[in-house]
Amino acid sequence: MKKTAKHFCPHCQKEVSWQDNPHRPFCSERCKMIDLGSWFSENYKIPGEKKPSEDEDDN
């Protein structure tokens, strides 16, 4: 018997079928687009050193 892992949508936490899901890891196109909008709005950020602005480079 093959075990299947449970997967959950990163946005709404609904259980998601992984196989044949064109939106994975999301449950739907809606959750996928909400997540993309959060990246575009800079609600999500990857930690790292702050990049100096162009004005600071002139010194």
Swiss-Prot record:
Q: How does it assemble?
A: Interacts with GyrB.
Which residues are noted in the entry as Zn(2+)-binding? 9, 12, 27, 31
Q: Which UniProt keywords apply?
A: Metal-binding, Zinc
UniProt-recorded name of the protein: DNA gyrase inhibitor YacG
* Reported function: Inhibits all the catalytic activities of DNA gyrase by preventing its interaction with DNA. Acts by binding directly to the C-terminal domain of GyrB, which probably disrupts DNA binding by the gyrase.
- What gene name is given for the protein in this entry? yacG
Q: Which family does it belong to?
A: Belongs to the DNA gyrase inhibitor YacG family.
Q: Which GO molecular function annotation, any one, does this entry have?
A: zinc ion binding
Per the record, a Pfam family? YacG
Which species is listed as the source?
Geotalea daltonii (strain DSM 22248 / JCM 15807 / FRC-32) (Geobacter daltonii)
List GO BP terms, alphabetically. regulation of DNA-templated transcription
Q: Which cofactor does it need?
A: Zn(2+)
Q: How is the cofactor bound?
A: Binds 1 zinc ion.
Q: Does the keyword Metal-binding apply?
A: yes
